């Protein structure tokens, strides 16, 4: 006979997000209001000015698999507790080395402490929610939302310098990732001419690669060579149609309409 147990009133959730050259994972328990007050002077849940575990039950944990920066401070790859001190206008966001929960909290174990403004929560109001949003190559925002309140803090990383060194080393080896290097130099490496050279070499061994022609077209437009870009986008369209790629067909047609 299968034995069932009562589900937790604050079910646990773990979110994992690729970020930069690593990952961010957050594990926390999600309390619901259930008619109770929160973020007030004498509220039942998370009263103003009091240290909060930022969730329920055990410590809310955040793990970075790669070094990041929060509040201009380097945070080494590791697992930390997230504590907060809610306020009416601002919150204190705290990352702490101890992962044993709020009862074991010591201020001297704080790794970083930042102040962030309170915003209006337009998402889930009943159940406490943590999201990772606004994801860019080197930055993202971690959002905490409950009731009518939302706060967020930025997480930053540095990938450009490491990618530059990596691609320079790979291009000097026997295995040369020309297309990947071209994409890097165009998107992040701030070297359109080197990007154009690398994608041109890549196309020599794969002339039907519509995605390579598409990248080449965008690089040529950025450089200002519209004549070459027109030729490249036509090749993108032809190769995309031949390969059955409707997405790249639409992308090519959109550029053709603008050139």
Language-model segments: residues:
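Short, solvent-exposed mixed-charge patches
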Residues: 1, 182, 258-259
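Start-of-domain marker
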Residues: 2-59
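Short, solvent-exposed cationic patches
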Residues: 40-53, 95-106, 174-175
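Long, contiguous interaction/recruitment modules in multidomain scaffold/adaptor proteins
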Residues: 57-171
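Alpha-helical adaptor scaffolds
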Residues: 164-220, 224-228, 238-239
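TPR/TPR-like alpha-solenoid helical repeat scaffolds
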Residues: 218-223, 244-259
């Amino acid at each position: 006979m299968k034995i069932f147990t009562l589900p937790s009133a604050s079910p646990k959730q773990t979110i994992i997000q690729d970020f930069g050259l690593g990952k961010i994972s957050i594990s926390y328990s999600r309390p619901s209001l259930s008619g109770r007050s929160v973020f007030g002077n004498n509220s039942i849940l998370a009263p103003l000015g009091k240290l909060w575990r930022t969730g329920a039950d055990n410590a809310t944990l955040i793990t970075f698999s790669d070094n990041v920066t929060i509040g201009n401070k380097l945070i080494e790859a590791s697992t930390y507790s997230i504590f907060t001190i809610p306020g009416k206008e601002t919150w204190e966001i705290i990352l702490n080395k101890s992962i044993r929960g709020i009862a074991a909290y010591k201020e001297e174990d704080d790794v970083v402490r930042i102040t962030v403004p309170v915003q209006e929560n337009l998402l889930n109001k009943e159940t406490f929610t943590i999201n990772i949003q606004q994801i860019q190559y080197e930055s993202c925002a971690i959002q905490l939302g409950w009731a009518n309140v939302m706060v967020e803090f930025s997480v930053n990383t540095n990938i450009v310098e490491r990618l530059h060194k990596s691609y320079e080393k790979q291009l000097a080896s026997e295995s040369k990732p020309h297309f990947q290097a071209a994409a890097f130099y165009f998107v992040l490496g701030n070297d359109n001419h080197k990007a154009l050279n690398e994608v041109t070499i890549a196309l020599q061994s794969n002339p039907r690669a519509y995605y390579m022609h598409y990248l080449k077209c965008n690089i040529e437009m950025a450089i200002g060579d519209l004549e070459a870009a027109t030729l490249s986008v036509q090749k993108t369209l032809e190769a995309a149609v031949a390969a059955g790629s409707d997405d790249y067909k639409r992308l090519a047609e959109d550029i053709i309409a603008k050139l």
